[in-house]
Structure formats: structure tokens, C-alpha cells
Amino acid sequence: MPKERRSRRRPQPIIRWVSLTLTLLSLCQPIQTWRCSLSLGNQQWMTTYNQEAKFSIAIDQILEAHNQSPFCPRSPRYTLDFVNGYPKIYWPPPQGRRRFGARAMVTYDCEPRCPYVGADHFDCPHWDNASQADQGSFYVNHQILFLHLKQCHGIFTLTWEIWGYDPLITFSLHKIPDPPQPDFPQLNSDWVPSVRSWALLLNQTARAFPDCAICWEPSPPWAPEILVYNKTISNSGPGLALPDAQIFWVNTSLFNTTQGWHHPSQRLLFNVSQGNALLLPPISLVNLSTASSAPPTRVRRSPAAALTLGLALSVGLTGINVAVSALSHQRLTSLIHVLEQDQQRLITAINQTHYNLLNVASVVAQNRRGLDWLYIRLGFQSLCPTINEPCCFLRIQNDSIIRLGDLQPLSQRVSTDWQWPWNWDLGLTAWVRETIHSVLSLFLLALFLLFLAPCLIKCLTSRLLKLLRQAPHFPEISLAPKPDSDYQALLPSAPEIYSHLSPTKPDYINLRPCP
């Protein structure tokens, strides 16, 4: 349904909104492909003003989770953003300022179907290559958006936001016919083996993902009968027909296989929601550009870089050692200075006490002499014979005081510097002696490490090489059951008539990264 607008008057900067609302309740089947075509043009003499088209719908949480799946480089990508409080999804992701482009969203009831095993590139939401042409006095840019939606219900609104100088607008939307259903021959479905179908299906998938490697689990796809009886199990993911990997192998000797479980070799095709569903094994994708079997090469460091690094490390350690030693020396010097002050105060106090003691002895001797003179004047003998007691005299020893005065200062008796061996005295300052001490210590440490270096290097290199040789591997399929087990084996290969087998219901495929 095209809409056109042409104007020959002087253009003005305006904004155009072109909206299209469709009721897809009666039109949309389980899977629909829509082709959105937009042409934008401006007058040739007014080319300085950029034009941009934005295509918006609504947001779907399924789409946001779908963005975390392992996309290949050639698969369509999108980014999530918020504009005026509403979430917006951009196809493709914006890269700088674009002259022509769009942003798209998908409703809560619709989601893109890509990538999935068995899909071709035209089934994925993607942009066609933009083209430019001249139409009269207009430059016209044309681009097509392909959307592949499923299970659409309710109103589906597409809005193009276009701004420029009176642009020429042509917009159309139409549905691409559904691909024909695969023609399965009228044969017994019990003879449809799963292994052959997997191989044929993966061969078709390789065309859609040329830059990816496809991995699968080496186990048959045991699955609950969710496709037949609409049953669910607790350890099965939402919307998946295959359970988790730990229950892909089912011991059939423990329970009846007809109660709740399905053997894919007995029935591989199912008719679900107006289409055939194909039970598939767990398949995953990996980017070949990031996964390589060749181990990364080890580049030897240049000798100049090694010497520079070693020299810088040595100089840094030497500086740290000198700084620490200088700080310790300063603290020790401060402590000695404080102790010297305390020592001087003690010596002064002792000398003063000795002087006072001498004065007391003089007073005692003077008093004794006065008493003797008084007793003799009175006609008696001296004091001691009169009282009939031995006379005592105060004798003060000065040897300890003399030794205390001969003490040298504490700074001269305590060494704060590193002592040279064999009592060498080169007349160097404390900083120079500390620096030489640090350099000699590092030199001795380096000599010690040189003796242990060969052993350490050998151990480290062997460990690193062992880790580097562990290249990523892809598991191969195993057609035989595990030995000494009760697991059922798979049936023989399928006839060549199943070469055109392809899926039409890819909801039950589990895509996850390779281990």
C-alpha cells in the first residue's frame, strides 16, 4: 500500500510519520514472513540535510533473550535502546550517523525466527542491500526489511518516522508466501532413523552458517512426550522438547518406555500446530574465527626488554631499600639523642647529690670538733672517751663519681651505621654506606636466584605449554551405545529418499555454545 508525497515549493524542515496498522489475527499463521519496503527521496538541489527513517513496533522479552544466542557474523544483529521511555530495538545496530536506516521492534506475540538449524538466510530478519536511484528531481534511497514472525495475534503496528526537507515517501508491506511443506513418502515412520536425518539436516544448515562450526551431542535425543501428549517435565527448559543433557540417555530397563518417554527411532516426525515437527539432537554453533585447533605461539621476549625490565626492577628495589634504611637510621639517631639527654640529666643529678653529701660530711665534722673543744674546756676528755664509745667518721668514696664522669656520649658508643667486615673504615657517609649495602644485598639475592632459575623456568614453561596445547575440540557422534549398559541402540541408516527432509517447526532446537 504505497503512500507518496511530492512538492515543488521551497522545502521546509519537517517531520513525517507514516504508520500502517494491520490486523493479523485472521491473516497470521504459525509462521509468516513479511517484506517491508521503504523508499526515501529528497530534491537533488537540497542534499545537505540528512534523512533518516525509523521503523518501530513493540518490545518482546523473548527477543531480548534471543540476542544472547550464538549468532554467526553473517546473521542479523540488533541492539536495545530506550527512546522517550520506550524500549527500541535497532536492526542493524547503529554505526555512527546513518543517512538511511530503520529501527524495528516486535510485539509481545511475535518473535523473529533466526538463527535455527535448517533455516536459510531469507528466513532471518535482515536488511537487504540499500540502493539509490534518480527519480526526476529527487535522489531516492531504497531498502527492504525482511521479518519472519510466528504466532502473531491482535494488532500489528508499523510506524516509520521520517524527517527531512519535504521528502518523497514510498512504503509497502506484503507477505511472502510460505515455503512448500516437505513431501514425505508414504512409508512406515518406524523406519525413520534419527541419525541419518540429523546428518541430512546439518548439511542443509551449513549453507545458512558458512562461518560457524556445528556441534552436536554424542547421544540419541531421548525426549518426553511433550509433542504427543503435551506433557512437561521439571528439568526441561521452557519451550523445548528436549530435556537437559544429563537425561538424554535413558536407561530403558528401569521403566516402561511407553509411559511418558519417546524413542526417536520409533517416531521421528510429529504434526504440531498445523505443521510437521522434527525431533532433533542438541546442536550448538561456534565461531570458527575464535575457535582454532592450532595452539597459540609463544613469542620470546627480546633480550633488551628483559635487561631493561631487570635493571628497572633492581634500581627500584635498591631505592626502596635505601629509603627504608634511611628512615630506620633517622629513627635510631633520634632515639640516641633522646637517650643522651636523659643520661646527661642523670649525671647532673648524681653530681649534685654527691656535692650535697660532701656538705653534710663537713657539717658533721665541724659539729664533732665543736663538741670535743667544749668537753676539754670543761675539764673532761674528748667526746668519745667521755661517752665511752668508738668515734665514727664519714668517708665518701669518689671512685664511682669519677667513672661516671669518664663516660663517653651515647652517640659515640652506639653505632647507627652498617659495620664493614674486618673493621674497614673507608670514611664514607651513612647514605653511601647504605646504598652499597643494598646493592650488595640485591647482588647476592640475584646470584641465589640464578642457581634456582633453570628449575623454575623449566617448570613454568612445561605448565604453560601443557595449557596452550589444550585446543578446543568438537565431539563426534557415537552411533553405538555405551559399553556394558542397558541403553537402546539406534536403528540402521535411512534410505536415500529422505534426502529432502527439512524442519518446519524449529521451536524444539536447543542452540548453545560448544564446550
UniProtKB/Swiss-Prot annotation:
A motif (CXXC) lies at residues 212-215. Glycans are attached at N129, N203, N230, N251, N256, N271, N287, N351, N398. It holds the Pfam family TLV_coat. The keyword Repeat does not apply. It comes from the Viruses. Residues 457-515 are cytoplasmic. GO terms for cellular component: host cell plasma membrane; membrane; viral envelope; virion membrane. Residues 330-376, 388-420 form a coiled coil. Keywords: Cleavage on pair of basic residues, Coiled coil, Disulfide bond, Fusion of virus membrane with host cell membrane, Fusion of virus membrane with host membrane, Glycoprotein, Host cell membrane, Host membrane, Host-virus interaction, Lipoprotein, Membrane, Palmitate, Signal, Transmembrane, Transmembrane helix, Viral attachment to host cell, Viral envelope protein, Viral penetration into host cytoplasm, Virion, Virus entry into host cell. InterPro entries: TLV/ENV_coat_polyprotein. Residues 365-381 are annotated as: Immunosuppression. Residues 34-435 are extracellular. Residues 1-33 form the signal peptide. The chain crosses the membrane at residues 436-456. A motif (CX6CC) lies at residues 384-392. Specific enzymatic cleavages in vivo yield mature proteins. Envelope glycoproteins are synthesized as an inactive precursor that is N-glycosylated and processed likely by host cell furin or by a furin-like protease in the Golgi to yield the mature SU and TM proteins. The cleavage site between SU and TM requires the minimal sequence [KR]-X-[KR]-R. Residues 304-324 are annotated as: Fusion peptide. Gene3D superfamilies: 1.10.287.210. The record marks R301, S302 as: Cleavage. The mature envelope protein (Env) consists of a trimer of SU-TM heterodimers attached by a labile interchain disulfide bond. The surface protein (SU) attaches the virus to the host cell by binding to its receptor. This interaction triggers the refolding of the transmembrane protein (TM) and is thought to activate its fusogenic potential by unmasking its fusion peptide. Fusion occurs at the host cell plasma membrane. The transmembrane protein (TM) acts as a class I viral fusion protein. Under the current model, the protein has at least 3 conformational states: pre-fusion native state, pre-hairpin intermediate state, and post-fusion hairpin state. During viral and target cell membrane fusion, the coiled coil regions (heptad repeats) assume a trimer-of-hairpins structure, positioning the fusion peptide in close proximity to the C-terminal region of the ectodomain. The formation of this structure appears to drive apposition and subsequent fusion of viral and target cell membranes. This is Envelope glycoprotein. It comes from Bovine leukemia virus (isolate Belgium LB285). The gene is env.
